[in-house]
A protein has these predicted regions:
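Short, compositionally biased
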Residues: 162-164
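A contiguous, surface-exposed recognition patch within enzymatic or periplasmic domains that forms
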Residues: 10-18, 22-147
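Short, hydrophobic/aromatic-enriched beta-strand segments in well-ordered soluble domains
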Residues: 145-159
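Short amphipathic alpha-helical leader/targeting segments
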Residues: 19, 159-160
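Asparagine-centered strand-capping/turn motif at beta-strand->loop junctions
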Residues: 5-11, 156
Length: 164
């Protein structure tokens, strides 16, 4: 399945914008976002990527799992405290596991582009109702009547093998 997002500048003047595509997931699952490859301190002293926090994000919230390979956020219908992070996701994918099903969303990353929200091309949000996997395209200036087209490949849900 493929979803195509199109934005058209209907103004009489140019605008700067970034496409922002939300995949709204059912309650009760968890989002899985890949970490950048781990490298020992002796091999790499430079930062790997930005981690952007919103003012209501609580990194001690038990719905978060901060692992070596993945960052995970669990959706809990009994917890009404919203959580959100943004990352520069160079692998270009995020997944949602609900029971035995795994939904994978893929999106591009352009290392030469500027991204909104301190350089994020991927954000995840949850509250007591849903979890969102958000993909952001690069910031760009669009002339009147110009169309921005961003394709997002969505892989058919499949059986998962418990990502850890």
């Amino acid at each position: 399945m493929q979803v195509v997002h199109r934005l058209t500048n209907q103004n009489l003047w140019p605008v700067e914008l970034a496409p922002w595509a939300l995949s709204v997931m059912a309650a009760g699952g968890r989002c899985i976002v890949p970490q950048e490859p781990f490298r020992p301190h002796t091999e790499d002293l430079l930062p790997a990527r930005p981690l952007v926090l919103w003012s209501y994000t609580d990194m001690a919230d038990p719905r978060w799992t901060w692992g070596t390979k993945y960052v995970q956020l669990r959706q809990d219908p009994f917890n009404n405290k919203p959580q959100k992070i943004g990352v520069r996701n160079t692998p270009g994918w995020a997944a949602y596991q609900l029971g035995e099903d795994l939904f994978i969303k893929t999106f591009p990353f352009d290392p030469s582009a500027r991204y909104a929200d301190f350089g994020c091309n991927n954000e995840i949000f949850t509250n007591e109702v849903i979890l969102e996997i958000e993909s952001l395209g690069p910031l760009a200036r669009f002339a009147p009547r110009r169309v921005c087209c961003a394709c997002r490949k969505l892989v058919t849900p499949q059986k998962s093998d418990r990502c850890r």
